[in-house]
Structures are given as structure tokens and as C-alpha cells.
């Protein structure tokens, strides 16, 4: 990078969905962005990803609506989530009409990354693929990293600050939290994949899964004590995906790419009364796309911002979520939006302040969703689903609450910015109102650690 201009110079490390969201948000709000990804190509494995309206209202602003138009075929048309026990008996119909009042998306992860990547390039984000980043450092004036290409070239890249969006195994996190952050094994893992729709169409035993999807996509969940399967269609039945949370009997490595044998899935569900019906769909997963990865429990970190206020963690690097919440990417997109908005309101001379403001606004809310996701999973595991009656406490329902999906993070940031600035500058706590107070107490959510008043430091 050349000499620093008037724009905020943003370095992003990690270009998954959240890193791309940060790149787009920062660039569309007038900042200069250089993003790095160690892979040569942007790719994603696994199944589909859902984005609720707390994220899609952010995406709808990108490119004056152009990104939303590209994603329009993937707007969720499901009217309900149907929850069943292992015999296939319908336990609960969870209405989605309020959740889907604003557009929600459900689409293959790879398709979302493609659309976001193309838009990022179009608006002028500088993207370096196949480049590993190391040695992050900061001072009161800015931050830098060392970029290592596959050809062995070593280059120091300097900017105003660094967004660390390099995932749950973040290497950048050490620069912010020197002590290692060790997740706790949950004892569970997840199979997940896309189904080969073309072969699925030709299987008469699987014809049931296409019923009604041209009008309303399917979202079915099946429970057995100790396991859970979700089966979804999107784009009016053009794509089917599934995932299964199950006991981890292999002590899997904590990576997304642990290979799996489809027969493991068959062994798991063949004892279910509904097992053969589900297998008629799942067997159409291509073996090379069949993955199995462990689910780990992560405590909220103490903080996300570095000592000089020039590095910030976002997304899974800051607050990994269990799949139960369906909010992993959506919360990361909120991070990106709040950070970019805070930068625009603060200006280049107050970059460190902007990072602390974004952390204060997001910390309690993201921590609450993180803890809820773990608690919901634990509740599911301890329930006797075959004995479950619909009039019991509705523990089967997914956490689809208005305070989560109805939130407008940009409007909230613009409204609260000056109040948070005062709290940061005076070294006081900021009590965020973007989560319910009652829930904050129930979950034991605290505010982010209060540091030395920022006004006593250099900008």
C-alpha cells in the first residue's frame, strides 16, 4: 500500500462471509479496503446458510439494492418449521410469517460467497488471494501485518487498523488476547451437506420431499434423544440441504473438513422409524461433499479490541455460535455494519475510538446470542422427544425472537454513537439496549471490560 490518504485504510484478514461483509460495508461507507485470504480461491463446503432479517436489511443497502436483487431467488418461502419426533409424528408447527415479514435468505454457502465476492471487486475492494498474513503489530498511529505469498514474497502492509475475521481458529486473536482461548468439547458433532438434486429427482422413494416445494420451501426438523436432523429446500425446491447433530464418538479434529463416510449417517438413523424415509434423501449426497465436524462450546471473550485500539475481532473469531441459533453469519454481518458505521461517524482521526464504540455496541448482544445457542442445544439433547407432547413447554422451538431478527444495527449505532463515545472517553460502562435486560440477567451477560479513559491516550 502506498502513502495513507484521507480515507480510513482498512486491512482485513480472512475472507469468509463475515470478512467479505466487512469489506463491502467499509468500502461502501467510503473507506479504502485491502483484504487478504490464505486460500487461492474463495470456496465453501457444507450445506446451506440462512440469513435472517437483522442481516438482510444490511445487505439490501449494498449496491443500492443490487446484491439483494442477485439474492432474490433465495428469499425464504417457507411458512413454518415442522418439528417431528423419530417416528415422524409432527410435534410442533413453528410459524415463520413474522420472522419472514422482511426477506430472509437460504442458499448454498458457495453461492453467497460468490455474489459477495463479485460485488466487493466491483466496488473497488483490493483482494489478495493465496496470501498468508502473520506478525500483526500496532502502535498509536496504525497497524501492520506481514503478507506472505505462495512464491515466498514477504511484504509489510500498513493501514489504520486491522479487522480480524479469520474464523474460530483465528491466528490473529493472539495479538489481542495473548492467553490461548480453549473451547470446551460438547460431545457432539454435525454431519452437513448439500443433496444432489438431479439424482434425487429420479428416486421414486424420495418423491415425498418435493411435495409442495414449488409454492413453499420445506423446513423439517426430526428429533431423537441425542440427535437432530434438519432437512431444508430453497429456491422452490431447486436445492436441498441437510444437517445432523449427533454424539461425537470419534473425537474429531476441530476443522470444517473432517471427511465422513455416508454409512456413518445410515448407521445412526437406521434404527429410527422414520430413518429409511430420511435416508432416501440423504443418500443422494455426493460422498466427497459429506463432512463431519465437532461442535465446541465457547465462552464469551473478555474483549475484542487490542490494547492500542488498532485490531478488532469480528464474527467467529470473536463469538462462535452453535448452529442452533441459525445466527452465526447474521451476527457477524451485524459486527461488520456496526464497525463500518462507527468508522464513518468517528472519522479517520478517531479510528481507535470507533473500534471501541463498535465493541461496546456489539459485545453484550453477540454474547447473549452465543450463550442462547449453547443453551438451546443442551435443552434439545436432554429432552425425551418420543414422549414429548405439544402442550409441554415449547423447548423444541428455535430461538426466533424479535429482538434478534427485528434489530436494525445501523439505525441503533447512529442513535447511540455519541452516548457510547462519552462512555469510552470517560472510562465508564455502556449499557446496551439492543438485547432484553431480563435476558441479560438470566444469562449473566456483563458489559465488555472497561479500560482506561480513551481521552487520556493519543488518538
Curated annotation (Swiss-Prot):
Pfam families: FAD_binding_3. Keywords: FAD, Flavoprotein, Monooxygenase, Oxidoreductase. Changing residue 232 to A/E: Abrogates the catalytic activity toward paraherquamide L, while paraherquamide K still exhibits about 2% conversion. Its cofactor is FAD. The active site is at 192, 232. It comes from the Eukaryota. Changing residue 397 to A: Reduces the catalytic activity toward both paraherquamides K and L. Pathway: Alkaloid biosynthesis; Secondary metabolite biosynthesis. It is an enzyme of class 1 (oxidoreductase). Changing residue 52 to E: Reduces the catalytic activity toward both paraherquamides K and L. FAD binds at residues 18, 37, 47, 50, 109, 133, 316. Disulfide bonds: none annotated. GO terms for molecular function: FAD binding; monooxygenase activity. Belongs to the paxM FAD-dependent monooxygenase family. FAD-dependent monooxygenase; part of the gene cluster that mediates the biosynthesis of paraherquamide, a fungal indole alkaloid that belongs to a family of natural products containing a characteristic bicyclo[2.2.2]diazaoctane core. Within the pathway, phqK catalyzes spirocycle formation through two parallel pathways in the biosynthesis of paraherquamides A and G, using as substrates paraherquamides K and L, with paraherquamide L, bearing the dioxepin, being likely the favored substrate. This is FAD-dependent monooxygenase phqK. It comes from Penicillium fellutanum. The gene is phqK.
Amino acid at each position: 500500500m502506498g502513502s495513507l490518504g484521507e480515507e480510513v485504510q482498512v486491512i482485513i484478514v480472512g475472507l469468509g462471509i463475515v470478512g467479505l461483509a466487512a469489506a463491502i460495508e467499509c468500502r461502501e461507507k467510503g473507506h479504502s479496503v485491502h483484504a487478504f485470504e490464505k486460500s487461492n480461491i474463495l470456496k465453501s463446503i457444507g450445506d446451506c446458510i440462512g440469513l435472517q432479517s437483522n442481516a438482510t436489511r444490511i445487505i439490501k443497502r449494498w449496491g443500492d439494492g443490487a446484491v439483494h436483487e442477485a439474492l432474490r431467488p433465495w428469499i425464504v418461502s417457507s411458512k413454518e418449521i415442522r418439528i417431528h419426533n423419530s417416528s415422524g409424528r409432527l410435534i410442533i408447527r413453528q410459524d415463520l410469517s413474522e420472522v419472514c415479514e422482511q426477506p430472509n435468505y437460504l442458499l448454498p454457502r458457495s453461492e453467497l460467497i460468490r455474489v459477495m465476492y463479485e460485488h466487493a471487486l466491483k466496488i473497488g475492494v483490493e483482494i489478495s488471494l493465496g496470501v498468508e498474513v502473520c506478525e500483526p503489530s500496532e502502535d498509536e498511529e496504525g497497524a501492520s501485518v506481514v503478507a506472505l505469498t505462495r512464491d515466498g514474497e514477504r511484504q509489510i502492509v500498513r493501514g489504520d487498523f486491522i479487522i480480524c475475521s479469520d474464523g474460530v481458529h483465528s491466528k490473529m486473536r493472539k495479538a489481542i488476547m495473548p492467553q490461548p482461548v480453549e473451547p470446551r468439547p460438547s460431545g457432539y458433532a454435525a454431519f452437513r451437506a448439500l443433496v444432489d438434486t438431479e439424482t434425487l429427482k429420479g428416486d421414486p422413494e424420495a418423491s415425498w420431499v418435493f411435495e409442495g416445494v414449488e409454492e413453499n420451501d420445506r423446513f423439517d426438523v426430526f428429533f431423537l434423544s441425542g440427535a437432530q436432523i434438519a432437512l431444508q429446500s430453497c429456491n422452490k425446491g431447486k436445492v436441498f440441504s441437510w444437517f445432523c447433530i449427533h454424539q461425537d464418538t470419534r473425537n474429531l479434529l476441530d476443522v470444517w473438513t473432517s471427511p465422513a463416510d455416508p454409512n456413518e449417517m445410515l448407521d445412526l438413523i437406521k434404527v429410527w422409524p422414520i430413518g429409511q424415509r430420511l435416508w432416501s434423501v440423504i443418500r443422494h449426497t455426493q460422498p466427497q461433499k459429506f463432512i463431519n465436524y465437532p461442535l465446541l462450546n465457547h465462552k464469551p471473550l473478555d474483549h475484542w479490541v487490542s490494547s492500542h485500539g488498532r485490531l478488532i475481532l469480528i464474527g467467529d473469531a470473536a463469538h462462535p455460535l452453535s448452529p442452533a441459533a441459525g445466527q452465526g453469519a447474521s451476527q457477524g454481518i451485524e459486527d461488520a455494519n456496526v464497525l463500518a458505521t462507527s468508522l464513518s461517524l468517528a472519522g479517520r482521526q478517531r479510528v481507535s475510538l470507533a473500534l471501541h464504540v463498535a465493541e461496546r455496541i456489539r459485545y453484550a448482544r453477540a454474547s447473549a446470542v452465543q450463550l442462547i445457542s449453547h443453551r438451546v442445544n443442551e435443552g434439545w439433547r436432554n429432552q425425551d422427544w418420543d414422549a414429548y407432547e405439544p402442550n409441554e413447554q415449547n423447548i423444541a422451538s428455535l430461538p426466533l425472537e424479535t429482538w434478534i431478527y427485528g434489530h436494525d444495527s445501523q439505525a441503533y449505532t447512529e442513535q447511540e454513537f455519541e452516548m457510547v463515545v462519552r462512555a469510552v472517553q470517560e472510562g465508564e460502562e455502556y449499557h446496551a439496549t439492543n438485547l432484553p435486560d431480563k435476558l441479560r440477567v438470566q444469562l449473566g451477560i456483563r458489559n465488555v471490560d472497561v479500560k482506561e479513559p480513551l481521552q487520556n491516550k493519543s488518538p
